[in-house]
Amino acid sequence: MDQTAAFHISVLASGSSGNSLYIESEKKKILVDAGLSGKKITSLLQEIGKTPEELDAIFVTHEHRDHIHGVGVLARKYKLDIYANEKTWQAMDPLIGIVPTEQKCHFEMGKVLTF
């Protein structure tokens, strides 16, 4: 791993009402979880000087509602890829609405996922 790589993290929300992190590196801008409405996530991004249009993807840690509430809306509206493991996809898929297959990205637990 490159020891000189830098990234910035902003906690947008944390708690039972919703969770979301914004992570930015030199190459990518990722939303980790979107547990609030798409509108609220957009507002929180704007508070840190960012917009959903700048995002490259959404990474979902698990399928609980306080982590996925805005995932489907944001992915559809901004054509964002969604990354989740197979079990999370199975549980989350019927809850987030229709997302184009090409935006559904799977990863294996324990494997390194490089952005």
Language-model features: locations:
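Short glycine-enriched loop/turn motifs at secondary-structure junctions
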Residues: 26, 75-76, 97
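Active-site metal-binding motif and surrounding structural segment of the metallo-beta-lactamase
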Residues: 38-88, 103
